[in-house]
Amino acid sequence: EDLTLTKNAQPAIMATSIAILKTLEKEGFKIKKSKFVAGHSLGEYTALCASGAISLADAAHILKMRGIFMQEAVSVGVGAMAAILGLNLDNVETLVAEIKDNEICEIANDNEPNQVVLSGHRTAIEKACVKAKSLGAKRAILLPVSAPFHCSLMAPAQENMINLISGLNIEKPIVPLISNVTSIPTQDIEEIRKNLINQITGRVRWRESILFMENSGIQKVYEIG
């Protein structure tokens, strides 16, 4: 049960992914031969750790605090997230514009052409699910998460993360990191630092990140985690 808590789940997921990477390395995989690294949401920290930009200890500490700050940012039950399946990004952006009033309803993850995740106030997200189905979504599913991640409700968590990430020792990654918030690669330390802070409230542009890889000629991807 303790592992389901965000403050414990985040470093645990990262550690599991790094353990898998170490197993692959024993079989001959070399990350320095990769063209890019990328990670979805907290996976971005795993990617940075894997590429030598941050230490395992720092990644675990930052993710634990990230989980605590995210959990504390919004009272339990106030926020929610939902996956919308079967509508593209343009459709969902139109939906969000119609739902938003005095409550938060934002796109948190642009995962693939027909899977977009919303985040915000629970009542707004529930309305969005109903609206999505009326627009032809195959499914609109509330997600079993403890907080509404990657939306402006996470602003208090973002503020708390600024000091932590500002003081984080970051080295130049051995291969470029494709950032969640920009969907383009960088090895610039201050750019990485800024993107990690913006990621707390920002959209995970995963579909665009994968498209960037495809357009860059990537034909083989190692998915770890």
Predicted segments — roles?
Residues 1-92, 143, 220-224:
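FabD-like malonyl-/acyl-CoA
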Residues 117-120, 125, 212-216, 225:
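Long hydrophobic alpha-helices with heptad-repeat/coiled-coil character
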Residues 1-34, 163-224:
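Acyltransferase/transacylase module recognition
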Residues 51-203:
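Alpha/beta catalytic cores of group-transfer enzymes, especially the acyltransferase/condensing modules
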